[in-house]
Amino acid sequence: MSDKLVWIDAQGSWNGAKEKVTGALESGANAVLVSPENVERVRELGKMTVAAAEGNPDIRVIGIGSEGDGTLFLPHDLNSSEDMATAKALKAQGTTTAAYVRLAGKEYEQFAARMGKLCDYLIIEGDDWKVIPLENLIAELGGSGTKILAKARDIDEASVALQTLEKGADGVLVDVDDPLKVREIARAVSTKQAGLGLTPVTITAVRDAGTGDRVCIDTCSLMTPGEGMLIGNQSSGLFLVQSEAEESPYVASRPFRVNAGAVHEYVLVGEKTRYLSELASGDPALIVTRDGDARKATIGRVKIERRPLLYVEAETGDRKISAILQNAETIKLVAADGSSTPVTALKPGDRVLAKLEKEARHFGMKIEETIVEK
C-alpha cells in the first residue's frame, strides 16, 4: 500500500487561482502549482508546499513556458537542452525541482526520462492520458527516487490513476477549473489508500488479562460503524478494532475515537506499524473499513488510562494472532459478516476480521527475516 501525492494546478491570475488554492488547503493536497507572481499570496493563505516556474517557491518547476511543454523547440541533441542545463544548475545549488513534460511524441518521452534523472519530481501530461507510456519512464527512473505525477483533468482520470498506476506513478496533478471539483478530487485522492486484504479469523480464546495501561486514539475524523483501526500484539496479524461510532445505552457514541488497546500493541499507519504508546497529537493515523478500504486521518489526542484488560486470541490455518483490549462493552471487533461484536461478548468460534502478513517487521517496516512473536 502506498500514499498518492496530490498536487493542484492553480496557475493563472490570482482571481481564478485563489479558490483552487483554498480548496487545496482545505482538502489535504500535498502541493499547489501556481504562477510565479502568486507564490507569496499562497503563503499568506496558509502553510502549503508551493511549486512554480520562477520566483522563490518550495519546488522549482522546469519546463513550463519552455521546452518541456513545447513552448520552445526541443533540440534533437538533448545535451543541448536549456531545460536540462537549468535542472543541472539548480540541482548543484540544492534546489528541490520538478520537471514538467508534455508527452507530444517519443522524443518527449526520452526527454522526460532524462529530466526525471535530474529532478526530484516529474510531472507528465499527455493528450490521451490513458496511453501515457508510464512503463517506459518507470523503468528508466526505477531506483532514482524521482516521484512521478500524472496530470488528471477530472475525477475519472484521477480514479484511474489510483487504480492503474498503483505500482508506478506516485500521484496526480489535478487540473480542473471548478473549485468544488478541486476539493472533491483532492479529498478522494489524498485520503484514500490502496485496498487492504482483510481475512476472517476464528476466535480461540478470550480471557481476563488483569489491569494495565490502554490507549484511546481520538482522531480529527468521524468514523461510521464498520470502520476502525488495525491493532494487535503481532505486527503480522492485526484485528480490525471498530471505532466507538455506535450508540450505547451506557455512554454516548464517540465516532472520532478508537479504544485501541494496551500500550505495547501495534497499530498500522500507512505502510508501517507503530506502538500505541508512541502516538501523539498531530501524528497520522489510518482508518480502515470492513471492506478493507482505507483513508488517512490525523490524531487529535491520545489518552492513556489504567483499565481492566482482556486477552483475545484467534487463528486461521496454522497461524495464531492475539490482542489485549480493554474489558468493556463499547470496545468491538468487526465480525466476518461486517457486523460488530463487543469484546465482552466474544466466544470461541466467533469469526472476526484481521489483516495478516507473511513478513515480520523491524522498526515498523516489513522485512524478510525469521521473527517469532508470541
From Swiss-Prot:
GO molecular function annotations of the record: 3-dehydroquinate synthase activity; dehydroquinate synthase activity; NAD binding
EC number: 1.4.1.24
PANTHER family: 3-DEHYDROQUINATE SYNTHASE, PTHR33563
Family indicated by similarity: Belongs to the archaeal-type DHQ synthase family.
Function recorded in the entry: Catalyzes the oxidative deamination and cyclization of 2-amino-3,7-dideoxy-D-threo-hept-6-ulosonic acid (ADH) to yield 3-dehydroquinate (DHQ), which is fed into the canonical shikimic pathway of aromatic amino acid biosynthesis.
Any coiled-coil regions, as ranges: none
Alphabetical UniProt keywords: Amino-acid biosynthesis, Aromatic amino acid biosynthesis, NAD, Oxidoreductase
An example Gene Ontology biological process: amino acid biosynthetic process
Annotated NCBIfam families: PRK02290.1-4
Protein's UniProt name: 3-dehydroquinate synthase
A Pfam family annotated for this UniProt entry: DHQS
Domain of life: Archaea
Catalytic reactions on record: 2-amino-2,3,7-trideoxy-D-lyxo-hept-6-ulosonate + NAD(+) + H2O = 3-dehydroquinate + NH4(+) + NADH + H(+)
